[in-house]
């Protein structure tokens, strides 16, 4: 059917942001820092309002978010599956609805990342019983945005090669050696587990981020 994704709003669920008492510098979760630096026009496409989304106290933030987002026409979700599920259940509690499709009939996409989605899939299908609902995974960290799922028919993710990150891949079987090989993208093989090493335009040089990938 026809998509209404851009006709509604994106529900963004991030962390908290505050100012350091000594220096006045902004500090907080990466998601909150990114949110605080998005252009103002993006707020028109998003819910909840920025001042609510960046609240530091979760006990204050959760019910306030649930009240505010339940009144919006939400078509997409973006966040970590565990925390998003808590919010969705709070929305159902506030609205006294049976499932999320009764609150947001036009909801069709959840862009998730941060943790393995597999243990949450059935829980989401119960809360959002909709055939049109799609789930797309992203792979990012404080060090950079690395990959995202670009097709609904495969769980593979597309590696981003033009986003200021140079990748090297160390075979896990060689990781404990004194001089393991660090392979470029053109040298990797399918079916092999690799430790990810990155150099970035943010200043990281051959930094091992602690993740493993397989092509």
Language model features with spans:
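Active-site glycine/GP-rich loop and adjacent strand/helix microenvironment
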Residues: 25-215
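Carboxylate/His-rich catalytic cores and anion/metal-binding grooves
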Residues: 2, 6-32
């Amino acid at each position: 059917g026809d998509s209404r994704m851009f006709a509604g709003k994106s529900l963004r669920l991030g962390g908290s942001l505050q100012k350091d008492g000594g220096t006045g510098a902004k500090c907080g979760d990466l998601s909150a820092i990114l949110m605080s630096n998005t252009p103002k026009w993006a707020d028109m496409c998003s819910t909840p309002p920025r001042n609510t989304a960046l609240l530091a106290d979760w006990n204050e933030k959760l019910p306030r978010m649930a009240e505010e987002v339940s009144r919006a026409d939400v078509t997409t979700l973006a966040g970590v599956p565990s925390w998003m599920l808590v919010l969705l259940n709070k929305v159902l509690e506030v609205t006294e609805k049976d499932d999320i499709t009764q609150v947001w009939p036009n909801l069709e996409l959840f862009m998730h990342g941060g943790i393995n989605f597999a243990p949450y899939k059935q829980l989401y299908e119960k809360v959002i019983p909709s055939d049109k609902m799609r789930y797309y995974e992203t792979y990012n960290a404080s060090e950079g945005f690395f990959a995202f799922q670009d097709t609904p028919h495969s769980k593979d993710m597309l590696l981003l090669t033009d986003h200021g990150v140079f990748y090297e891949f160390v075979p896990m079987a060689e990781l404990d050696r004194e001089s393991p090989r660090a392979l470029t993208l053109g040298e990797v093989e399918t079916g092999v587990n690799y430790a990810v090493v990155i150099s970035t335009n943010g200043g990281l040089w051959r930094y091992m981020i602690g993740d493993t990938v397989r092509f």
